[in-house]
Amino acid sequence: MVFGDLNERPLKKRRFFVDEEDTHPPSSEAAPVTTNLDTSTISSAGPEGSDVRQQQLNGAVPFPNVKESSRESPGLGPEDKQDNLLKEDEENNGTVDYEILNHSPSIHAQQDQRVDQGLTNGFGGQPSGERTVSETQAFQSSGGFDTSTFASIIGEHLSPESLEKIRKASGDDLERAVNIYFDGSWKSSNNSLSQPLVAPHQQTLSNPCTPVNESISQTVNTKISKKPNQAPSSRCLSQSSRYIGAFGVGAWATRSGVGLLKHGEHVNVERARSQPVSKRGRGGKLITNQKGDVLTRFTNKSGQEIGRLPRETAEWVSTLIDQKICRFEGICVFAPDRVRVNDTIYLQLWCYLRKEAFLPRNLWNMGDDNRSTAFFEEQESAEEKQLRLRQVALVKLFDEIGLQPTTVNDMTKKHKKEGLLRAAEIAEQYDKTKREGKSNESSEDEESPELEEDQLDTLYKKAQSFDFNMPEAQPPPSFVLNLRKYQRQALHWMLAKEKDKKSGRELSMHPLWEEYTWPTKDVDDKDLPAVEGQAHFYVNPYSGELSLDFPAQEQHCLGGILADEMGLGKTIEMLSLIHSHRNVSPSRQGPSSSTELVRMPSSSSAILPAPNTTLVVAPTSLLSQWESEAMKASEQGTMKVLMYYGVDKSTNLQELCSAGNPAAPNIIITSYGVVLSESRQLAMFNSNTQGGLFSVDFFRVILDEAHVIKNRRSKTARACYELRATHRWVLTGTPIVNRLEDLFSLVRFLQVEPWNNFSFWKTFITVPFESKDYVRALNVVQTVLEPLVLRRTKTMKTPEGEPLVPLPRRTIDIVEVELSEQEREIYDYIFTRAKRTFNDNIEAGTLLKSFSTIFAQILRLRQTCCHPILTRNKTIVADEEDAAATADAANELKDDMDLQELIDRFSASMENADTAEAQDPSAKFTTHALRQIQTESSGECPICSEEPMIDPAVTACWHSACKKCLEDYIRHQTDKGVPPRCFSCRAPVTSRDIFQVIRHQSPSSTPTETDLYSSTPASSPHPAPRISLRRIHPLSPSAHTSAKIHALINHLNRVPANTKSVVFSQFTSFLDLIGAQLTKAGISYVRLDGTMPQKARAEVLAEFNRTETFHQEEIDEDEGPDTPRVRISSKNSRSSPKSPAVLLISLRAGGVGLNLTAASNVFMMDPWWSFAIEAQAIDRVHRMGQLRDVSVTRFIVKDSIEGRMLRVQERKMNIAGSLGLRVGGDGSEDEKRKERIEELKLLFE
C-alpha cells in the first residue's frame, strides 16, 4: 500500500493518528495507569470474581483466554512476529522509513512517524503478530467504504486513484477518510514512503551500536550529539525494546456501544497532543506559555477510540511515550459487554524500555542538568520542563511496576523518591502560580527562605571546629613571607586536598546512579530471553538518564573552599599553595571525570593543557592587589605573573601556557567580566576563542570573593563553571550569604559529586528545608561543608587562650546627627508622603503589591538623611548650578573664595592704575579690609561691640561683624518689612551675600579641637594657614553642606596627624558632595567607585597606600614574632605632605577584598539593611597587617528612618527558634506577609 505524505496535516486532525511510535503500531502501544482501581465495578460484571481479577491486575494470576501468540517473547518485544509482518507488508507493498528522533520532535517528524506506524501495523488496530495475510487482504477488500456517501459529504467527485489513496489511508473508515480529505494530506507526495520496509525491531544487530539501516545512522548523527565525557552508555540495546515489568490500570470509556472491547483483546494507545503555544525568550530559549496536553487514548482493533487513561497516570505515561523512553503493550482485563460513557475498563500494561532511552541526549541545546530544573525561576523553558517530567515519570514508573535497584547510594536510599516528587511538585506549583498572575504579590515569598545569623552559625559549626593540632606545612624558599601557625596549617590542609588520589584506589559507582537488574521472568512468570553481556542497566533519577555501562566515579574534588573570615590572609595562604604545589610533569593525569558538567560546544581544535599555570579570577578592584601581593611574596625571578585584562587580552594563552614554553606564566590574573565576555564569544560563535581562557586546561583555578557567583542562574556563574582545571578553589569569607542555594553554586563550580547536580541538591537539601525539616536539611549541608571548607574567624582562640590573630583593638561608635532646620523640613515632608502611601496600601490590602513604590520612598528618605539635594530632580539642580555660576560671574563673587587670591586681585587692580587719582577707592578699601581679616586686626564688632569678633563674617561690601550679629540684623530688618542695608555703608545686603571667614588648619600642624567654622587662631609656630571666605547660604545647590558632611569634616579635623581615613557610602552622588566639601576644607583625598576602570582603581589604591603613615621604629616596636615581614623603604618612612589623607569609596566597589590597612579610621556615612555588608567594609581596614587601633564611626541621623533600620537589623538578628534552626519568614505564607508588614510598620513609626 502506498499512502500520501501526512506532513501537512493540521494539528487539530492529529487525534486520528498515533504519536511518533516507531517500534509498534498504535495497536501495540498503551499508556500506563494507576493501580488505585475501583474493583467494585469488576465484581458487578463478567464471569470472574473481583478478587481474582484484582490479582490479575497485580500480576499474581495470569489472564485466561489471551492468545499466547501475543506474548511468546515479551522480553524482546515484537521481534518474534517479524515474519508475518514482513509478509503482510510485502503483499501490501507497504514501505516505511524509520527515524530516531530526540524527545522534542518536530511536527513533521511526528506526522511521518504516524504514517510509518500505520504502515507497520496495517492500521487495523490489532497487534501485527496476530494478523495473517488473509485477514489483511480481507480487510482491504472490505466493502464498508461507500464512495457515493463519501462524495456527497465532501461535495466533489474524485478520480479513482485519489479515492483509492484516501480509502487505504483511512483503513476503510469513512469518518477518518473525510478528515483526511479536508486536511489535504492525501494531496502530499509519497516520497518518504518509497523505501522497502525495514522495522528496527525486526533486525538482529551484529553490532549493538550499529544502526539498522542507512536512514537511522544519518538521523542519529544529525539529531543526537554526544555529550563530552558523559556517563550514559556507549552501548545500545541489542533489540528495539526490552521488557521491565507490568501493572494494572483502570481507564474510563469515552463512548458507548456493544462489543467494543473484549476480555483478553489487545488495545492500542494513541497520544494525541495539542501543540503548546511557544515563543523564543532571551538567549533564544524556548518558553512554553501553555500547559501541554497529556491526553492518552486507547483504541480497539478496529481503530475506534474506546476511552482514555486517567489523568494522574496519563501525566507520566505520556512523558515516557513522548520522550521515547518506554513503549507499552495493553491487554483488556475487563470491559462490560455494553460499554457506556465513563464506565471503568481495566487494562494491564506491559512496559518496555526502548533503545532510544539509552542514547545520549543533546544536553547542550536544552541546558545542563543543573540549570534545566529551573527551581524558583521566573519561567520554566520547554526543555527544562521536559527534564522535570522525565524524572518524575521514571520514578513513578519504577514504583508502579515494583522495580527496585540492586545497588544504590546509602545516602539517597531513604528520601530519594519523596524528595524528587516533592521538588517537582514545588516547581509545578510555582509554574502554576506564575501562570495565574500571582507573581506580584508573592514574588519574594517564592524565593527560598533566608537563613538567620544563628542558622549560619549552626552551618559553620562543623567547618569551624578547627583542630589546632593539625599538622603544619612549610612553604618552599621561593616564598619569602613568614606564615603564621594557622596559615601553615591551612597550607597543609590545601596540599592534602590537592594531592588526594583516593579516586584511583577503587572503582565505585557514581553516587547519582542506581543499578537495576533486567527481569528474567515476565508478569505471567514466563522466562524472558537473556541478552549476553547486558544483565544490568543503570538509571540516574536526578538527570533522567539511562545507561548500559557502569557509571564509575572517576575523580572527586581536588580543591575546596577556603572560607577564613575577612582579613585573615586568604590571598597569602593561596600564594603559598601555588609555590608549594607545582606540576612537575608536563603530562596530564588522564581525562576529566566522565560525570563532569556539560561542556560548551567546542571546535575541532584541542583544548591544550597548561600544566604550570594557575588562573586567578577576582573582582576588578582586586586585580592589582593580587599582582602586587604575588610579586611581594615571591623571591625575585621565581614567579611569572600575567595580568590578563584589557589590552593584555591579545595574548594567545594556548601558545603562552603550553608545557614546553619556559616563559609560561605561573599565575594569570583576570576578572569575572573577562571570563563572562569570553564565554559569550564562545557560545555565540560555537567554537573556542582563539587562545582565550576556555582554550586551555589550567593546573589550578582560583575564584576570589567567590560569593560573586552565588546565583547559579547568573551568566557569570555559568561562565565560571566552564573553566577547565585539575584543581579548583574558591575564596570567600561568606560561603553562604543568606540562602542555601548560595553554597550550591560554589559546590557546582568545584564539581563535588553528587552535590553539583541541582536536582540531587533539591531532593536532599532544598525540599526538606521547604518542608520545614530543618534538622535534616542543615545536617546534610554540614555534611557537605565539613570535607570541603576550612574556616577560621578572628574571634577564635588558641588552646592557650590567645587570639588566633593578634589584631589591634577595634571600636565602633554610633554618632547621632541632628538635621538642620531646613533639612528636617524636607525630611518631614517626604516622610509624611511615604507614610500616607504606606497607610493607604495597608487599608486597601495591597501593601505587598506596592513594595517597589514604598521602598522607592524609603530610599528617598535615606538620601535625605545624607543630603537633601540627592532627592531633587537632576535637571533642575543643573539649571540652578548654571544660574549660580552666571550670578557669581556678574558680581565677581563665588560661594567659596580664597582670601589671599582676593587680596592679590584687588592689589593688582590698584597697581595697574596709572595714577593715584585713577585708583578705585572701593578697591583700596576692600584691600585694606581683607588685610585686616587676614591679620585678625579687624577690631570689635560694630553691632555687639565684642572684641575680637566671634566667628567673623563679611558682607559683599566688605564690612565685618560677628556672624550671628549680622544674621540677626538682616533677619530683624526683613521682619520689619524693610529692605536690609549694610550697617556701615547702607548698601543693600541679603543673607546670600554674607561670607564666613574660614581659617583652615596648617597641613603641617597638629589639629586641635577647633570646630570647622571656628575663627579662633591656632597657636602654632608654623606659617599662617589658608583663609577662605565662604558664603553662608551658597547660590549653588551642591555647595550646600549637610549635617552628615558637617559631622564628617569635624571628625576628620580631629583625626591625629599622619593618620589616614576611609569614608564609605553606598551613594556615589553623595561621595561627589563629600569630595567638594573636603576640597573646601583643605583635606586631600582620592576616590574609588565602580565606574572607574581597573587601571584607575589600581592608581588610586597605589596613591593611597604609597606612603606609610608611621615610622619604621613604630613597626619594629609593634611587630610580634608571628607578624609577617613587611618591607618599607627608607624614602617612605615619613609622610609626604601631598599624600591623600582620605579615601572616598563606594560600599559596593570597596566592600570586599581590598587591603586598606594604611588607614585606621573608618566612617560609615549611611547604614545598609544588613550589617554584614558594613562589617565586610570595616574588615578592609581591620585585618591582618593592621598595626594601629581601628576606630569606626557610623553616622546615624537622629529621629529618622536610619535609626529604625538599625532596629530592624537587631530584630532580625535576635529572632531565634529552637535549636537555632528558625528561618526568616518561617511559617505559612500569611505569617511571612505579617512579618514583612511588621518590619515596614517599624520603619514608619
From Swiss-Prot:
UniProt region (Disordered), positions on chain: 1-85, 117-145, 430-454, 999-1024, 1110-1138
Highest taxon above the source species: Eukaryota
Keywords: ATP-binding, Cytoplasm, DNA damage, DNA repair, DNA-binding, Helicase, Hydrolase, Metal-binding, Nucleotide-binding, Nucleus, Zinc, Zinc-finger
Record field: compositional bias (Basic and acidic residues): 1-10, 430-441
Keyword Kinase (UniProt): no
Sequence ranges of Polar residues compositional bias: 33-44, 129-145, 999-1013
Stretches assigned to the Helicase ATP-binding domain: 551-753
UniProt cross-references to Pfam families, sorted A to Z: Helicase_C (PF00271), HIRAN (PF08797), SNF2-rel_dom (PF00176), UBA_Rad5 (PF24975)
Major localisation: cytoplasm
Family annotation (InterPro entries): Helicase_ATP-bd, Helicase_C-like, HIRAN, P-loop_NTPase, SNF2-like_sf, SNF2/RAD54-like_C, SNF2_N, SNF2_RAD54_helicase_TF
GO cellular component: cytoplasm; nucleus
Sequence motif DEAH box, residues: 704-707
Cell cycle keyword on record: no
Alphabetized SMART domains for the sequence: DEXDc, HELICc, HIRAN
Residues reported in the UniProt entry to bind ATP: 564-571
Positions with biased composition (Acidic residues): 442-454
Gene Ontology process terms (BP): DNA repair
Low complexity bias spans: 1129-1138
Helicase C-terminal domain ranges (all copies): 1047-1227
Stated family: Belongs to the SNF2/RAD54 helicase family.
Described purpose of this protein according to its UniProt entry: Probable helicase, member of the UBC2/RAD6 epistasis group. Functions with DNA repair protein RAD18 in error-free postreplication DNA repair. Involved in the maintenance of wild-type rates of instability of simple repetitive sequences such as poly(GT) repeats. Seems to be involved in maintaining a balance which acts in favor of error-prone non-homologous joining during DNA double-strand breaks repairs.
Protein name, UniProt field: DNA repair protein rad5
